[in-house]
């Protein structure tokens, strides 16, 4: 019986902590959600432009090296 309790205790503690976390969490309000969405969109755009310019720079360099 002691082994069963010893085996089940980590799962029980994890479930208890998870339930406490979910109860404590709150949904973001509209203003906070918009701020997060805008920050994410700006980050995606910046990363896209960086990738585009890196590709734009490396295409001519690659053509010079390969000689096509």
UniProtKB/Swiss-Prot annotation:
Extracellular side: 62-68
Cytoplasmic side: 1-32
Entry keywords, A to Z: Endoplasmic reticulum, Membrane, Protein transport, Translocation, Transmembrane, Transmembrane helix, Transport
Main location: endoplasmic reticulum
Location within or outside the cell: Endoplasmic reticulum membrane
PANTHER family: SEC61 GAMMA SUBUNIT
Protein name (record): Protein transport protein Sec61 gamma-2 subunit
Species in which this protein is naturally found: Drosophila melanogaster (Fruit fly)
Taxonomic lineage: Eukaryota, Metazoa, Ecdysozoa, Arthropoda, Hexapoda
